[in-house]
Regions:
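Hydrophobic residues in alpha-helical segments
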Residues: 38-39, 145, 169
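Short, well-ordered secondary-structure micro-motifs
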Residues: 41-42, 70-72, 107-110, 140-143
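Generic hydrophobic/packing signal
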Residues: 3, 34-36, 124-127, 148
Length: 173
């Protein structure tokens, strides 16, 4: 797993050609990607990659709220994610977006849910997954970056946040 979009388009096209030669019945290739790496690619480059066999890009949106994104040091903004997802769509690629329920903690829960739904509404991802935030490297380490005011959501709070998200979500399909 990794962000293949960090590689130059020329190299990605070479890799896709090798995959297609080795696996003649290959149906699709997918990749994770960060919005900031897609910013370095043109729609034309992404279209070339699609024509060479790349079909799905998995984008870890995590949040559509700039304050949450800043606090978790994502290195992305609402606008950088929006731009990347619209570029994916324009190139004819399929987008699969992941958001993290509970990422804003108690303090930023509502704005996280609403702004994330708004970003999804604007970009209309093909697939949308919600995951619950976890702390594989420890909650204390997460707090160091987020700030001491982070209080994780209770189970009830997680359900309320997803309800707020869904109430503001308006996907066309």
């Amino acid at each position: 797993d990794g962000d293949a979009m960090v590689l130059p388009t020329r190299r990605l096209l070479e890799i896709l050609a090798e995959l297609n030669a080795a696996f003649p019945d290959l149906q699709r290739v997918s990749s994770y990607c960060l919005p900031r790496n897609l910013a370095k690619k043109t729609v034309e480059e992404l279209t070339q990659l699609r024509e060479a066999g790349l079909k799905i890009l998995y984008v870890g949106m995590e949040s559509g709220d700039d304050e949450v994104l800043r606090r978790i040091n994502k290195g992305e903004t609402w606008e950088s994610t929006r731009s990347a997802l619209l570029k994916i769509r324009e190139a004819g690629l399929t987008s699969s977006v992941m958001v993290l329920n509970g990422l804003g903690g108690e303090t930023l829960s509502r704005q996280h849910a609403i702004n994330t739904a708004t970003l999804c509404n604007e970009t209309q991802p093909d697939y949308l997954s919600t995951l619950v935030v976890s702390f594989p490297q420890g909650e204390e380490r997460f707090r160091e970056g987020f700030g001491e005011d982070f209080a994780p959501l209770s189970q009830h709070g997680l359900f309320e946040e997803i309800q707020t998200f869904l109430e503001h979500l308006n996907l066309e399909r």
